[in-house]
Amino acid sequence: MRHYETLFVLKPTLTDEESKAKFEFIKEVIQNNGGEIVATEDLGVRKLAYPIQKFERGHYYIIYFTAPSHTVLELERIYRITEDVIRFLTIKYETKKDISAWEKMVERAKKLSGQTNSEAKEEANENV
């Protein structure tokens, strides 16, 4: 399994419930296609560097996960057809140096969200 990080930006016009529902939907897509979510980060609503689709702000989310390569293809297909996603980026970590950096980012994300590794796995299992 390969190591990935995906960041996506949702429209700021969505309510908190709608944003959380889209976030959960994206997590389900990853899990249903053979991926395992390691950590997540909700960065909240932030100002965009430049207007996208006439929006100046967006709700940012990051998901760190391991998955086979076909999962990313399906995930990006879903991003493209979901109207509420205004921008996305998926990064694959390949070298040992990249993977160790990925692991450090995962630990930082877990500390910020207050999750331990076992809590993240329990949450992932509950959502399946």
UniProtKB/Swiss-Prot annotation:
NCBIfam families: S6. The keyword Metal-binding does not apply. The keyword Translocase does not apply. This is Small ribosomal subunit protein bS6. PANTHER family: MITOCHONDRIAL 28S RIBOSOMAL PROTEIN S6, SMALL RIBOSOMAL SUBUNIT PROTEIN BS6M. Binds together with bS18 to 16S ribosomal RNA. One of its GO terms (molecular function) is small ribosomal subunit rRNA binding. Keywords: Ribonucleoprotein, Ribosomal protein, RNA-binding, rRNA-binding. Pfam families: Ribosomal_S6. Belongs to the bacterial ribosomal protein bS6 family. GO terms for biological process: translation. GO terms for cellular component: cytosolic small ribosomal subunit.
